[in-house]
Each structure stands twice: as structure tokens, then as C-alpha cells.
């Protein structure tokens, strides 16, 4: 596989120390990334394996577009068994930054980590030179000190994915960090820690072969000038502007006159009006610190940054000298939940320092720098919501030993004092006391602390599944569409295909026109909190959303920006280009490709995930044992009937019908929700069908 793929799998057995090379072309029908990860895990990690068992594996997988220069393509899919949900089923972490590109430049599509080292090690990769190095001197350090030490030993160009103390201590809600703030979560930090693997350091010099460089350049120019919007591909500005027909205050296209990177080197830089067409100014459109934290963040913002080969720059970079008072660096940044979640635990809000709302900005940078250095992971904010629930409902007072409860500075919590966050995160990362079990995950604390139905049914806690994972653009995002999407994976679904479309900022009439073109009817698309009963078009919308995220996690592309469903260009009538993934695929690999073929590959990957989940759970009845939804989704807003303006609560009968229709659309058993022999055969998964049949896991 000379173009796009490298053709190489690097297998590292930590138990034996053996490092071997395999051919990745045997998995080509699964494209890459998520597809490679699921196939390797299905073949090699049997039911009954626990996440910290030596037999569990950690699969880092890229795709043919990774590192190619295609916009937003530096993603690595990390597949393993869940540390934090019921049943320890297969999950993925999705890590940006520079690690994925360096993997490809070094010559690897996949890195398989297996076994367990006798003592701490780190994996050193420089092109074809691969070795396991002693890491005793790194054990106990945070992700940043670890990265700095390894870069001193290797090169400033080395990209290091490291765990902190949380991963070392097998904290279920832990992850790994590369390039300072780019995380891979889902418990993968604890998996690395269980294997005594402190870090993977990669430096590559080979590049990625492109079949048609001229076409690649043309596609890049086309996407950058005609199609791409801002973060989450929002395609209208957040304020009325001279060039824009529409605006939406919720849009992440936040650039405007009078809004500055206030702490930029050399003096403030105005973001200004950024009409489409100029590739060099795309990076000004998204201003996440102000979007996430409010106007008080402006004076501390140095710039926006981001992943390799991404023009959007959704990662805030701030410099707040006062933060040093709390023992952390004054610089740092992130995006989305990681930017703002830390001060949400304060019942009365964070305490301000000098300016209005600066407590939120300062407190979150302190929290962010601690959280990332320890290698903790928030489970899409669920860790902090669980804290709030347990504090407000008196759970901590009930379950913590009296001595431990007395030594915690609850007065700091009430006062919004950032020092509480310091103590809280230290306890979590170092497994100090009963409180630290909060980072075991929602399912574990519900069992351990006997939280009962009140916990699962509490709407503000936002737990979607009784398996212990939260909503991620669920019923509030196109009702049944988001609800189906949130049922399908074994963690929060990490799917932005539908929410990017919903949040684009275009008016409802235009959105419904696009929905009709894509899904056959305007009825696919409802106004938020004014939704209608399920219909066939909504099912097609849900399937499209899921297949696109699987495709993006396979090729790999960032699903926070892709697909190009709509455009900022009035001259295109705001239409995007949903065949762009196939066009890039062809230009990079040289293989003839249509979007229909890629969609079929995505369906193969998605169905393999379903089949592996069936196998791990040892049940065919996915409807009643897996695709479960917490009661608050149906019981919220008791004064407003379903299908009435003002609510996004779901109807139980309608949701049952929605799942039945979706199962049929996928070719799964309409009652059980598991793949059929016919569908597995249609998708080229005959070996999976035979294996499931041998275990009596196919429907009659």
C-alpha cells in the first residue's frame, strides 16, 4: 500500500520485549483507524478479558488520510476495553495533536501494545528504530515533565504521548496527553499504567506518499475557500457582519471587529470580520476562550492553536501570570469541556480576583493544567457532574469516613476558592481516600455508594445510559436522531455529524431544504424542542450521522469539523460537498473511490463494533440489554406533553419504534438489534458471522 497507508503494523509485546512488524494490508477492507482497531480487538481479545488483564490490548491506529496534509487529518484512534463503564466493553479514544501524523511519518499505520512490562518502560520510535527504554526515572512524574525529559533524550521534534500519576495509579477516568494539551481519554491512561508503559515517543521523517499531488492541492484550495466554516463547521458568524446574510449568536464563528487576541506576542491582534475565500484568515474565525469562558478571557488570550494540518485552530492558548500562584504554569489551553468544566463544581461559582468573571477564567486554567498534567479524564464532564450530585445530595457526608470528610476544605468549595480544585485533583490522581473513587466512573460509584434510581433519573446529572456514560448531543440534538446515536456505542458517542449540521447557524428553512436533499424529506429535521414523531427520513439521518463518524475515525478526519454538509458561501446556496472524503481518498491513495463505497466501508466498521459488543456481552438482545436510556430522558418537563413545543423529552413508545426502524435500516434483527447472518455476509464479515454462530449469538 504505497500511497496513503504505510502498510506497516508495529506490534510491541511488553511481556517478552519482542517488537515485530506486520502487514496492515490484510485489514484494508476496514480502511484504518477505528476499523483496524475493532478488527484487531475482535480477533485477539476474547470475552471475559478485563481491562487491566495482561491479555487486553491497546491499539493505536491511523488511516490513509492521516498525516497527508488533508485538512483536519491528524487523529489517531485508540481502541481497548473500557475501564469505567458496566461490562468493560470495547471503546475508543480519539486523540488529536501531532501524534498521529508522526506515527505515519515514522512508517506505521498501527501500533499494537500487548502484555505487561516487569517494570516501567517507555516506547521509543524513530522511523525504523524501535526500542523499549527504562522509565523508572519517569514514574511518578506528570505528563509535561515526562514529555520534557523524553524530548531532551531524543529531539524537540519528538511527539510524546504520556500518562501522568492518574494512569500510573490505574484511575479508571484517566487518559494520555500529547503535545501538551491533546488528550486521548476513555481510561486509556489506566490501561497504559496497568502495562507499566509510561509513554510512547514518536519521531518520523518519511512523510506520506500522495498519488496525485496536483489534485490534492486543488481539493485543499477548494475546501478552504468554498466549504470550510469554523469549529464544528459553523458557517455563519456569531454577530451580524457586512459580508454575511445570516448570523447566529450560538455560532462558533466568533471573529468580529473589536474582538482581540488580547495577550498576543507583540501586542493585541484583532480577529475582525473574516469572510470566506481567504485561506490565510480561516484560523481567526474560531475564538474558543471567549466562546467557552466569556469576555473575561479576551485579555489573557495569546492565540488559537490546534492539531497538525488543521486550519480551524480550536485550541485556546492563554497566558495568565496569576495562575503561577497555584503552582502551575501560567500558560496553557484547550477546547470545549476541558476549557470550562473545572469551576462547575463550585455551588456558588468561582471567586473573582480583580475583574468580573475572571475567577472562571483563572480557575479553569489552574484546573486544566493540573488535570492534564495528572492525566485525568472527565468523561465529557460527568466526573464533575457526579461531584456536584454527591455534594448537593449529601452522599459524601454519608459515604466518606468521618476523618476524611473533616479534613476536606468544604469551606473553600463554598467560597469558590481554586485551592479546592488543587486538593480535589490530587486526591483523584493519587487515589487518596474514599473520595477518589469518584474517578472510578458513574457505574462504579452508583454500585459502591448505593446511589439508586434517584441518581440515574436525575436530569441535571445528564447520565444517558445505565452503563455509566453521559449524553453527548443526544435528545437535545434532533430528538430521535441524537437519541439513537447515543445508544449505539459503549461510551458517550463522540459523534458530531448531526450536531454540526444542527448548529451551523443557517435558518431553519434552509436546514430543512438540505435535509430533504440528503434524507428524502424535510421532516428529517425538526426545530429544537419542537420535534415530531419518528419517520423514515429521521432514521436515514441517524444512520448517516453514525456512518460518517465511523468513516472519519477510520480514514482519519476530525468529526468536530467534517463532514462538509453545508458551506458559508451564498454563491453555493450554502450547500456543502458530502463527496469530499471520497475525493481526498482517491487523490491520496490513487484508488478509484465513491462516497457510496466509503459509506459501505463505514457500515462494515459500525456493524463490526456491534458484533464485537454482542460477543463481549454474550447476548443477542441488544435492545433490552444494551440500548438502554435513563428515565429522566422520558420523564423531564412533566408539565409539557411530548411532541409539544418547549420540550425535548422523549416518548417511550416512539423511541421503541425508532430503534426498531433503525435496526431494520441497518439490516439487524428488528426485535433484538443484533446483526444478522445475511447482513454480516453482505458486508464481507463472513468470519464474524461464523464466529457468532458458533457461540449462538446470531438471531434465528
Q: For each predicted feature, which ranges?
A:
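Feature captures the catalytic cores and cofactor-binding loops of soluble hydro-lyases/lyases
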Residues: 39-122, 130-133, 137-147
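N-terminal amphipathic, basic-rich helices that act as targeting or association modules
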Residues: 1-64, 70-72, 163-165, 182
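Extended catalytic cores of very large enzyme megasubunits
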Residues: 4, 19-20, 24, 65-72, ...
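A generic structural signal for short, non-catalytic loop/turn and secondary-structure boundary residues
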Residues: 2-5, 14, 51-55, 71, ...
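Short, glycine-/Ser/Thr-/acidic-enriched flexible segments
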Residues: 14-17, 25-26, 63-67, 83, ...
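Structured core elements
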Residues: 8-13, 20, 59, 102, ...
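Glycine-rich phosphate/pyrophosphate-binding loops
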Residues: 96-128, 194-208, 379-387
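Extended C-terminal regions of large enzymes
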Residues: 53, 74-76, 151-186, 192-700
Amino acid at each position: 500500500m504505497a500511497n496513503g497507508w504505510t502498510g506497516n503494523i508495529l506490534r510491541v509485546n511488553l511481556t517478552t520485549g519482542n517488537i515485530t512488524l506486520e502487514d496492515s494490508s490484510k485489514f484494508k477492507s476496514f480502511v484504518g483507524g477505528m476499523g483496524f482497531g475493532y478488527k484487531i480487538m475482535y480477533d485477539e481479545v476474547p470475552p471475559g478479558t478485563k481491562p487491566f488483564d495482561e491479555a487486553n490490548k491497546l491499539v493505536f491506529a491511523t488511516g490513509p488520510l492521516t498525516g497527508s496534509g488533508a485538512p483536519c487529518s491528524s487523529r489517531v484512534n485508540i481502541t481497548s476495553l473500557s475501564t469505567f463503564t458496566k461490562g468493560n466493553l470495547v471503546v475508543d479514544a480519539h486523540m488529536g495533536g501531532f501524534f498521529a501524523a508522526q506515527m505515519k511519518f515514522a512508517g506505521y499505520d498501527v501500533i499494537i501494545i500487548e502484555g505487561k512490562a516487569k517494570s516501567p518502560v517507555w516506547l521509543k520510535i524513530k522511523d525504523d528504530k524501535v526500542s523499549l527504554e527504562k522509565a523508572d526515572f519517569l514514574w511518578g512524574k506528570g505528563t509535561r515533565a515526562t514529555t520534557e525529559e523524553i524530548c531532551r533524550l531524543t529531539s524537540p521534534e519528538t511527539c510524546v504521548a504520556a500518562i501522568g500519576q492518574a494512569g500510573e495509579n490505574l484511575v479508571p477516568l484517566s487518559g494520555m496527553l500529547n503535545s501538551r494539551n491533546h488528550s486521548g481519554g476513555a481510561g486509556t491512561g489506566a490501561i497504559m499504567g496497568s502495562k507499566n508503559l509510561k509513554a510512547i515517543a514518536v519521531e518520523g521523517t518519511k512523510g506520506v506518499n500522495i498519488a496525485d499531488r496536483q489534485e490534492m492541492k486543488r481539493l485543499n484550495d477548494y475546501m478552504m475557500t468554498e466549504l470550510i466554516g469554523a469549529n464544528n463547521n459553523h458557517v455563519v458568524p456569531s454577530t451580524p457582519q457586512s459580508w454575511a446574510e445570516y448570523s447566529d449568536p450560538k455560532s462558533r464563528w466568533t471573529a468580529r471587529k473589536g474582538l482581540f487576541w488580547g495577550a498576543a506576542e507583540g501586542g493585541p491582534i484583532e480577529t475582525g470580520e473574516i469572510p470566506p475565500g481567504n485561506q490565510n484568515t480561516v484560523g481567526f474565525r474560531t475564538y474558543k476562550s471567549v466562546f467557552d469562558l466569556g469576555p473575561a478571557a479576551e485579555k489573557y488570550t495569546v492565540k488559537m492553536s490546534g492539531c497538525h494540518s488543521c486550519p480551524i485552530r480550536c485550541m485556546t492558548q492563554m497566558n495568565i501570570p496569576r495562575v503561577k500562584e497555584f503552582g502551575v504554569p501560567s500558560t496553557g489551553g484547550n477546547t470545549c469541556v476541558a476549557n470550562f468544566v473545572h469551576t462547575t463544581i463550585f455551588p456558588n461559582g468561582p471567586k473573582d480576583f480583580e475583574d468580573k468573571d475572571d475567577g472562571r477564567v483563572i480557575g479553569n486554567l489552574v484546573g486544566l493544567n493540573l488535570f492534564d498534567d495528572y492525566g485525568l479524564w472527565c468523561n465529557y464532564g460527568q466526573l464533575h457532574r457526579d461531584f456536584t450530585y454527591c455534594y448537593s445530595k449529601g452522599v459524601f457526608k454519608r459515604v466518606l469516613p468521618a476523618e476524611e470528610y473533616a479534613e476536606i476544605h468544604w469551606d473553600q468549595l463554598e467560597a469558590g476558592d481554586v485551592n479546592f480544585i488543587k486538593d480535589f485533583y490530587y486526591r483523584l490522581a493519587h487515589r487518596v481516600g474514599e473520595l477518589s473513587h469518584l474517578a472510578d466512573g458513574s457505574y462504579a460509584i452508583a454500585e459502591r455508594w448505593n446511589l439508586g434510581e434517584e441518581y440515574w433519573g436525575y436530569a441535571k446529572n445528564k447520565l444517558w445510559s445505565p452503563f455509566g456514560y453521559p449524553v453527548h448531543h443526544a435528545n437535545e440534538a434532533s430528538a430521535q436522531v441524537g437519541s439513537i446515536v447515543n445508544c449505539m456505542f459503549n461510551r458517550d458517542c463522540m459523534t458530531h455529524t448531526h450536531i454540526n449540521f444542527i448548529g451551523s447557524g443557517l435558518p431553519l428553512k434552509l436546514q430543512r431544504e438540505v435535509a430533504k436533499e440528503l434524507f428524502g424529506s424535510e421532516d428529517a429535521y425538526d426545530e429544537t424542542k419542537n420535534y415530531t414523531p419518528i419517520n423514515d427520513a429521521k432514521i436515514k439521518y441517524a444512520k448517516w450521522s453514525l456512518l460518517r463518524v465511523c468513516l472519519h475515525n477510520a480514514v482519519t478526519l476530525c468529526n468536530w469539523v467534517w463532514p462538509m454538509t453545508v458551506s458559508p458561501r451564498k454563491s453555493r446556496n450554502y450547500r456543502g460537498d458530502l463527496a469530499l472524503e471520497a475525493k481526498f481518498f482517491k487523490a491520496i491513495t490513487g484508488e478509484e473511490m465513491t462516497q457510496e463505497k466509503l459509506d459501505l466501508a463505514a457500515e462494515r466498521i459500525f456493524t463490526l463494533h456491534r458484533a464485537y459488543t454482542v460477543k463481549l456481552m454474550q447476548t443477542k438482545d441488544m435492545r433490552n440489554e444494551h440500548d438502554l436510556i435513563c428515565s429522566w430522558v422520558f420523564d423531564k418537563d412533566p408539565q409539557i406533553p411530548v411532541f409539544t413545543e418547549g420540550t425535548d423529552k422523549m416518548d417511550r413508545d416512539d423511541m421503541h419504534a425508532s430503534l426498531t426502524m433503525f435496526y431494520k435500516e441497518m439490516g439487524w434483527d428488528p426485535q433484538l438489534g443484533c446483526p444478522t447472518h445475511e447482513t454480516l455476509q453482505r458486508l464481507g464479515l463472513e468470519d464474524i458471522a461464523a464466529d457468532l454462530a458458533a457461540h449462538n449469538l446470531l438471531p434465528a
